[in-house]
Amino acid sequence: MVANSTGRDASALKSRKRAADSESEPLLKQGQPFPKQPRIGSELDKTRWRLKDDDSRHTWHYLEDDDAAKEWPQSYAEKWYLNQSLDLPDLPSPDSPLAAATNGLDFFEKLQLPSGHWGCEYGGPMFLLPSVVITWYVTRTPISPSKATAIYNYISARAHPEDGGWGLHIEGESSVFGTLMNYVALRLVGVEADDPVLVKARGTLHKMGGALYAPHWAKFWMGVLGVMDWDVVNPVPPEIWLLPDWVPFAPWRWWIHIRMVFLPMGWLYSKRWSCEETDVIRSLRKEVFIEDYAKIKWTSHRNDIGVVDNYHPKSWLLNTANWLIVNIWNPYLRPNVLKEKAEAWSSKQVDMEDANTDYACLAPVNATMNTVMCYARDGPDNYGVQRHIERLEEFLWVKDEGMLVNGTNGVQCWDTAFLIQAVFEAGLHKDEKWKPMLMKSLQYLERQQIREDCVDQDVCYRQPRKGGWPFSNKDQGYGVSDCISEAMKAIILLQKVGGLPEVLEERRLFDAVDTLLLYQNSNGGMSSYEKRRGGEWLEMLNAAEVFGRIMIEYDYPECTTACVTALSLFNKYWPDYRTKEVKTLIRTAAEWIKSNQRPDGGWYGSWGICFTYAGMFALESMKHIGQTYATGENSRRGCDFLISKQRADGGWSESYKACETMEYVEHPSGSLVVQTAWALIGLMEADYPHVEPLKRGIQLIMDRQQPNGEWLQEAIEGVFNKSCMISYPNYKFTFTIKALGMFAKRFPEEKLVPSWALQGNGIEKS
């Protein structure tokens, strides 16, 4: 494929436009009835799915027309996402770790998308797809048969093999949240109640107490859908947004993901807006409860919650506040003028979020709620509603199992930056073969830098973002400390070390540094989206129940390390720019990382699983302040912790349970290549002196590599809010290539080969 300077696929643009137009569903029309439920097919032809990469805006299209399918051939990337054969020849059997890294890059390079980045599913949470389906339903948005079938296939494939329910995420045990939401989603896309998948799931839901034991977010969605009465939903008072900013629990102090959800949720709660009753909704009222719907006393079930769902029980403070709002404030004291003022302010905040992201929104959780709010407020003909429906498509992803919803609109900038760094660690940037790939990546990151602050930044409580990079793309528009750092490192390496043209001038790197310096908290640690604004006691107001550490920004060893390493690299080439501030941040941030180390030598990770992930980053930070295994106690204890977890086969294995329990837990499936790579990278960053443990880990990575250069998917890699896991499938390339390259650079005399390449006393080339 040929990409032009904008990142759009020029060679296929015409045929893609025609194909996309022929497949897309009609937009909403004023006063239209509920669309007919789509016809669920038995199977879809995976060779007809196409991913449109509009400079990292991803949309999937199912091509019914044979000519359209021929005009828009399926790429290697699309085939890989769908688990189709790429028909690639086996590569020469690697005779060294560097050769294995080269083979891995040879495969991964073929997955680069036309605009220069790498895409992938970012799935895992099992409540996101149902939220989109409910949003489509209540806004009367037609669902094509191909979408409905793909959704049915995915949800069915992810049902628990024993009880048929669904959990909070794909590896979790069945919960009321997951089971109720996915049950409802299947019914809304046209699956009949007597379908075997739903019969089994309904039995599990009833055994857990039925829908009344769903957590807060599920009850909210059931209120929107009209399956439950709003009296069952614990309060989401929009009036809290009218509090003065100095109030210690004012919502501008909350973590961005919770306050962006609270805004549309509060508006809809205050309006008590529900979808018009339909036959499906009436049927659901009979199916998801074990009680007679007409006899349910909704207010008495506000606090009912399933055992599995109740990860973060409501505090006495929150329960007291909820009781006062429900029993005193709402019925007796709440003046209508204040209610309307709070709704108007929440509505304005939602509009600012939509404007600052061109309706892409922070993530699908608030995107779906914003869509419903705008529909309820403005009606279907409103431009904002139409644009919301259009942009929801960018959260959808198709894989071999079917259609899911990603946790954001992608991981484009994040994964691209890591791949670039891996190439440099392996020294592969010196090979002319990879220059076109690297140049496309550089141009992509250049285009995705955020060039301006938000409109009315102070009014909508947004952190300055000019010069930053997002997790996904600039449309989403949220700078994140580690995303800024990793992208900045990648660009400096490409332009200063790799000798590529300077497509991003130094003034724009200075903008990135200016923004990055704003993320440090008073204790030296670095947050994710914003500098911390409130105290940890605000977790007493955590109403989500299924998540932990959700109310405020925290300090993260991963984010802190990214900032330390990026600013260290920046200072090497621009030693005179804000020298004092840069060096002070590096020093104080590294001191925080030291203080965050646990007595056993590990660091707790908040964005990857878990101690292995954080340990890799923390040990890299220590290296940048001159501390290694030989020279520093923190590095030595960190290495000893990782070595103590190495398995007999040379690998590392950590379960998502470690994130929940905050204690190291091995994954039942055994060693995992991604966590093995993380551990090895951390050990090598710390100059761990004993080569044998490193060799054993490298051997496992080489043994798991396939003859065509790829690694196969294993356990889930990422996490957020302690309890919800999320997939990073590209990690099995970026970090394995990096680990292999680092080992080859440090130990060039070690000529390891994969076990599968050995025959007798020699090595057989495939």
Curated annotation (Swiss-Prot):
Q: What are the GO BP annotations of this UniProt entry? A: ergosterol biosynthetic process; triterpenoid biosynthetic process
Say where the protein is mainly found: other
Induction section of the entry: Expression is also significantly higher when CYP51A is deleted or in the CYP51B/CYP51C double deletant.
GO MF, one example: lanosterol synthase activity
Q: Which family does it belong to?
A: Belongs to the terpene cyclase/mutase family.
A Gene Ontology cellular component where this protein is annotated is: lipid droplet
Q: Which UniProt keywords apply?
A: Endoplasmic reticulum, Isomerase, Lipid biosynthesis, Lipid droplet, Lipid metabolism, Membrane, Repeat, Steroid biosynthesis, Steroid metabolism, Sterol biosynthesis, Sterol metabolism
**EC top class named in words:** isomerase
> Native species of this protein?
Gibberella zeae (strain ATCC MYA-4620 / CBS 123657 / FGSC 9075 / NRRL 31084 / PH-1)
Catalysed conversion reaction: (S)-2,3-epoxysqualene = lanosterol
Which residues does the Swiss-Prot or TrEMBL record annotate as the active site? D482
Q: What is its EC number?
A: 5.4.99.7
Q: What is the lineage of its organism?
A: Eukaryota, Fungi, Dikarya, Ascomycota, Pezizomycotina
Q: How does it sit in the membrane?
A: Peripheral membrane protein
Q: In which pathway does it act?
A: Terpene metabolism; lanosterol biosynthesis; lanosterol from farnesyl diphosphate: step 3/3; Steroid metabolism; ergosterol biosynthesis
The record ties this protein, via Gene3D superfamilies, to:
1.50.10.20, 6.20.120.20
Localization per record: Lipid droplet; Endoplasmic reticulum membrane
Pfam families on file: SQHop_cyclase_C, SQHop_cyclase_N
Location of region: Disordered:
1-47
Q: Where are the PFTB repeats?
A: 148-190, 586-626, 635-676
**Source domain of life:** Eukaryota
Q: What is this protein called?
A: Lanosterol synthase ERG7
Additional free-text comment from the UniProt record: In Fusarium, the biosynthesis pathway of the sterol precursors leading to the prevalent sterol ergosterol differs from yeast. The ringsystem of lanosterol in S.cerevisiae is firstly demethylised in three enzymatic steps leading to the intermediate zymosterol and secondly a methyl group is added to zymosterol by the sterol 24-C-methyltransferase to form fecosterol. In Fusarium, lanosterol is firstly transmethylated by the sterol 24-C-methyltransferase leading to the intermediate eburicol and secondly demethylated in three steps to form fecosterol.
Functionally, this protein is described as follows:
Lanosterol synthase; part of the third module of ergosterol biosynthesis pathway that includes the late steps of the pathway. ERG7 catalyzes the cyclization of (S)-2,3 oxidosqualene to lanosterol, a reaction that forms the sterol core. The third module or late pathway involves the ergosterol synthesis itself through consecutive reactions that mainly occur in the endoplasmic reticulum (ER) membrane. Firstly, the squalene synthase ERG9 catalyzes the condensation of 2 farnesyl pyrophosphate moieties to form squalene, which is the precursor of all steroids.
